[in-house]
Swiss-Prot record:
Coiled coil: none annotated. Signal peptide: none annotated. PANTHER family: ALDEHYDE REDUCTASE. This is Cinnamyl alcohol dehydrogenase 1. Homodimer. Belongs to the zinc-containing alcohol dehydrogenase family. One of its GO terms (molecular function) is cinnamyl-alcohol dehydrogenase activity. NADP(+) binds at residues 49, 167, 188-193, 211-216, 251, 275, 298-300. Zn(2+) 2 binds at residues 100, 103, 106, 114. GO terms for cellular component: cytoplasm. Binds 2 Zn(2+) ions per subunit. Accumulates mainly in the placenta of red fruits, and, to a lower extent, in green fruits placenta, pericarp and seeds. It catalyses: (E)-cinnamyl alcohol + NADP(+) = (E)-cinnamaldehyde + NADPH + H(+); (E)-coniferol + NADP(+) = (E)-coniferaldehyde + NADPH + H(+); (E)-sinapyl alcohol + NADP(+) = (E)-sinapaldehyde + NADPH + H(+); (E)-4-coumaroyl alcohol + NADP(+) = (E)-4-coumaraldehyde + NADPH + H(+).
């Protein structure tokens, strides 16, 4: 099927200002280009970074803005040069929808680190149109930035894997923490953290959840399958656990001290930062020098890794713990997410919300 001759409209829920309140918004889709697919959105996960975007926490938001970057949908149209997909395929779209294709990261297939990457919302596409995300009934996306959902995987389960899942999988894969027998820590038990526990366990790791309080202990151990649980304020237990972990995945999205967690790492251990924090973090250099430890970061994952994590989770039977909501609940869901009142990922039933009615 070729390019659309007439622009189509989409109906989404958009923020109009830094209040972050979403309401219905009709806008024009860009034409389906030669390598584009048009996707009817079925489900879309709600990520903490959506809150940052709609509330202008990073000072870079443009309005109106339709958020949502854990998108699962059905292909309803393909451009004439599309080879990877056909009408009727169930597919996923993540945070990145464009890149330069010429820089070193692009040539190494780590396009998420391209300096000219295009975000799926709050950005401008190559044709000059604003990009809008998955809290909408339709999207048009270049085939390079679309992945096929494995047959037999529930689409609502696939949605969180497109951000939360690959965000954990990518650093474990890149830094060589993907063999069995390792000891890992998961700091923070939200949407990304709960996927960290499940994916690390599926890789055969001994997993310790680290939290600021004891309230999630039973959930972590009994429901998510973690092996141990540490409360960071209990000094005796933290000291007993010193030098015990190969890595820590730090998912906390607010400013917090690093030194208590650096002490848990073995020699050559890595503290991997994933939370978006807009204020400086502090530590004293001997904390890393005296164990050759590293503080590093990781940002989502490549398209290749996104495909890998989908198949990994399908093969290992890894599922996300989700709470399904309709679009008219989205503002309440965002308020609850800000209070960490969700176990563990909201997924919006976009198609079931009947946005066009």
């Amino acid at each position: 099927m070729g390019s659309l001759e007439v622009e189509k409209t989409a109906i989404g829920w958009a923020a109009r200002d830094p209040s972050g309140i979403l309401s219905p918004y009709t806008y024009t889709l860009r034409n389906t280009g030669p390598e584009d697919v048009q996707v009817k959105v079925l489900y879309c996960g709600l990520c903490h970074s959506d809150l940052h975007q709609v509330k202008n926490d990073l000072g870079m938001s443009n309005y109106p803005m339709v958020p949502g970057h854990e998108v699962v949908g059905e292909v309803v149209e393909v451009g004439p040069e599309v080879t990877k997909f056909k009408v009727g395929d169930t597919v996923g779209v993540g945070l990145i929808v464009g890149c330069c294709k010429n820089c070193r990261p692009c040539k190494q297939d780590i396009e998420q680190y391209c300096a000219k990457k295009i975000w799926n919302c709050n950005d401008v596409y190559t044709d000059g149109k604003p990009t809008q995300g998955g809290f909408s009934n339709f999207m048009v996306v270049e085939q390079k930035f679309v992945v096929k959902i494995p047959e037999g995987m529930a689409p609502e389960q696939a949605a969180p894997l497109l951000c939360a899942g690959v965000t954990v999988y990518s650093p474990l894969n890149h830094f060589g923490f993907n063999q069995s027998g390792l000891r890992g820590g998961i700091l923070g038990l939200g949407g990304v953290g709960h996927m960290g526990v499940k994916i690390a366990k599926a890789m055969g790791h001994h997993v310790t959840v680290i939290s600021s309080s004891d309230k999630k202990r039973q959930e972590a151990l009994d429901h998510l399958g973690a092996d141990d649980y540490l409360v960071s304020s209990v000094n005796e237990k933290m000291q007993e656990a010193a030098d015990s972990l190969d890595y820590i995945i730090d998912t906390i999205p607010v400013n917090h001290p690093l030194e208590p967690y650096l002490s848990l790492l073995k020699v050559d251990g890595k503290l991997i930062l994933m939370g978006v924090i807009n204020t400086p973090l502090q530590f004293v250099s001997p904390m890393v020098m005296l164990g050759r430890k590293s503080i590093t970061g990781s940002f989502i994952g490549s398209m290749k890794e996104t495909e890998e994590v989908l198949h990994f989770c399908k093969e290992k039977g890894v599922t996300c713990q989700i709470e399904m909501v309709k679009m008219d609940y989205i503002n309440t869901a965002m308020e609850r997410l800000e209070k960490n009142d969700v176990r563990y990922r909201f997924v919006v039933d976009v198609a079931g919300s009947k946005l066009d009615q």
